Amino acid sequence: GSGGLIVMDEDTCMVDMARYFLNFTRDESCGKCTPCRVGTKRLLEKLEKITSGNGTLEDIDDLEALCHYIKENSLCGLGQTAPNPVLSTLKFFRDEYVAHVVDKKCPAGVCKSLLHYEIVADKCKG
């Protein structure tokens, strides 16, 4: 087993952080059991959809249900713990997920697809 502690601040996007960890666990899955092999891929697809600005509130609900399914039906510790970053961020930072899908904004300003720039013509000199 292993464990770790990561310190983050308001400049960390919790949705992107969950996506990062799911990317790792998807790559590390041995592929023996379907819940882990396919489930982590589906979770990652949903997270990528949300961080790209194409997610829906239904995707958030689907994430949570799929996390519980993977956790309860995977054969090994990797599959059983793979959903933890998603479940933790949904529990404590659900508002960030909602901001991504409803407001189409990343509160931390991390998700590039959700960044919008505007030129203020009267302040622009050039």
Go through each PLM region and give its residues.
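Redox cofactor-anchoring modules in respiratory/redox and cofactor-processing assemblies
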Residues: 1-116, 125
